Amino acid sequence: MRNASVTARLTRSVRAIVKTLLIAIATVTFYFSCDLALPQSAAAYPFWAQQTYPETPREPTGRIVCANCHLAAKPTEVEVPQSVLPDTVFKAVVKIPYDTSAQQVGADGSKVGLNVGAVLMLPEGFKIAPEDRISEELQEEIGDTYFQPYSEDKENIVIVGPLPGEQYQEIVFPVLSPNPATDKNIHFGKYSVHVGGNRGRGQVYPTGEKSNNNLYNASATGTIAKIAKEEDEDGNVKYQVNIQPESGDVVVDTVPAGPELIVSEGQAVKAGDALTNNPNVGGFGQRDAEIVLQDAGRVKGLIAFVALVMLAQVMLVLKKKQVERVQAAEMNF
């Protein structure tokens, strides 16, 4: 009986281990198959920064890493209060303006609307406010925006997107300020806020490869001998540009669907010359701001000090008037 019980337990354990391994293998397979099947569509999403730079999205130079894939510079604005009190909810507004009539190149080469995304780097201790602390008025401004922390231990770094650009050129973040009275690691004072905002797909993947939302150049000097259009089983179109150097073998440059060819067969090109136009209409921008975590006691003290100064000035004016009246009475006497 004892041996049978031990055997049963071992059998159940083995089954559990096998089941866990199968789930893990299926998950990994699904992840990589999606990455291979749809690499261009995923490259525009902010979570690529999380995977490539897990510690922080800001380099030591101050540049936010989204600029490594979104090469064009575009304006981004941020609005935060000059100062806030502890344990209060305020809003940070990130503005990502662009021409809504513009269309970008999609993963399949078709023209589609632009998406937007943003990263908000708050000071330590600041975080997205819980739902029960958000007023109805502020909730209306937020809409259905989903805020994702950069990592489990970095609630002060928040990413958003991709979102439809036509609806979200302004993204409202509900932020809860920390309370130094309950967290001894937090101190009153001035802090920096860093913001990055992008519109449209990136031009480079985190691996360094170009996306189809980029300019393609000739890799050799010579004459374009042939331009062949190819289509794979999934219907994805690409062009093979054959360049014949003065000596040596033909060099083949592959151009995906999306950018428009601006060269033709028989045309002479030099290495580095553009084979296509630049289809990118988006870009990335970042801004820095400052916010003060204000001590309520100091604010009250400042108000009291200002009131005393004003009262002293009033008393001085009244005293001066009194002296003037006394002097006038003595002169009349």
UniProtKB/Swiss-Prot annotation:
* Predominant location: membrane
Q: Which Pfam families match?
A: Apocytochr_F_C, Apocytochr_F_N
**Where along this sequence does the record place binding of heme?**
45, 66, 69-70
Which membrane topology describes this protein? Single-pass membrane protein
Secretion signal, residue range per the UniProt entry: 1-44
Give an example GO biological process: photosynthesis
What is the required cofactor set for this protein?
A: heme
Q: Where in the cell?
A: Cellular thylakoid membrane
Record note on cofactor:
Binds 1 heme group covalently.
Q: Which keywords does this chain's UniProt record carry?
A: Electron transport, Heme, Iron, Membrane, Metal-binding, Photosynthesis, Signal, Thylakoid, Transmembrane, Transmembrane helix, Transport
Which GO molecular-function terms appear in the entry?
A: electron transfer activity; heme binding; iron ion binding
Q: Which domain of life is it from?
A: Bacteria
A single GO cellular-component term from the record reads:
plasma membrane-derived thylakoid membrane
Q: Which InterPro entries match?
A: Cyt-f_TM, Cyt_f, Cyt_f_lg_dom, Cyt_f_lg_dom_sf, Rudment_hybrid_motif
Membership in a protein family: Belongs to the cytochrome f family.
Q: Which HAMAP family match?
A: Cytb6_f_cytF
Its biological function? Component of the cytochrome b6-f complex, which mediates electron transfer between photosystem II (PSII) and photosystem I (PSI), cyclic electron flow around PSI, and state transitions.
* Self-association state and partner proteins as the record states: The 4 large subunits of the cytochrome b6-f complex are cytochrome b6, subunit IV (17 kDa polypeptide, PetD), cytochrome f and the Rieske protein, while the 4 small subunits are PetG, PetL, PetM and PetN. The complex functions as a dimer.
Q: From the Swiss-Prot or TrEMBL record, give the protein name.
A: Cytochrome f
Q: Which gene encodes it?
A: petA
